[in-house]
Amino acid sequence: MADPEKQGPAESRAEDEVMEGAQGGEDAATGDSATAPAAEEPQAPAENAPKPKNDFIESLPNPVKCRVLALKKLQKRCDKIEAKFDKEFQALEKKYNDIYKPLLAKIQELTGEMEGCAWTLEGEDDEDDEEEEDEEEEEEEAAAGATGGPDSAEK
């Protein structure tokens, strides 16, 4: 694929389109805004500074540049399709939500509020009493600790 003589006509046309976009075609206006200021600023030679994105792409061989730019175009197309899918999916959800509303209202009407139960579990009352006693003891300890009573010094 790297050799232009071995490429088919479709591949060479795609490369031509991509190269036109890279050289200021229709995609130049919609390109990354981050790369534009980097091209305008003068480059100071710094050994430890990372190369800007633009220099990295320029350092690649032409066939690789073409592939990168073609992949960028394809990704933009995928993003547009995905946005369209999301929009249609939301519309579909809204449509079926409207259909479900009457059914959900009937279910809510039938179930209504929880009705009281005449019976209780055997150990349920004992557990409630123990929990209340524990809470009261904790409150007393907290109150004694806050006032600095004799109980707080012992613990």
Curated annotation (Swiss-Prot):
Residue segments, region Disordered: 1-60, 119-155
Gene3D superfamilies: 1.20.5.1500
Annotated keywords: Coiled coil, Nucleus
Localization: Nucleus
Source organism, top-level taxon: Eukaryota
GO terms under biological process: nucleosome assembly
Main localization category: nucleus
GO CC annotation, single: nucleus
Compositional bias per record (Basic and acidic residues), positions renumbered to this chain: 1-16
Biased composition (Acidic residues): 122-142
Pfam families: NAP
Biased composition (Low complexity): 27-49
InterPro entries (UniProt xref): NAP-like_sf, NAP_family
Ranges in coiled-coil conformation: 68-94
Family statement: Belongs to the nucleosome assembly protein (NAP) family.
Annotated protein name in UniProt: Nucleosome assembly protein 1-like 5
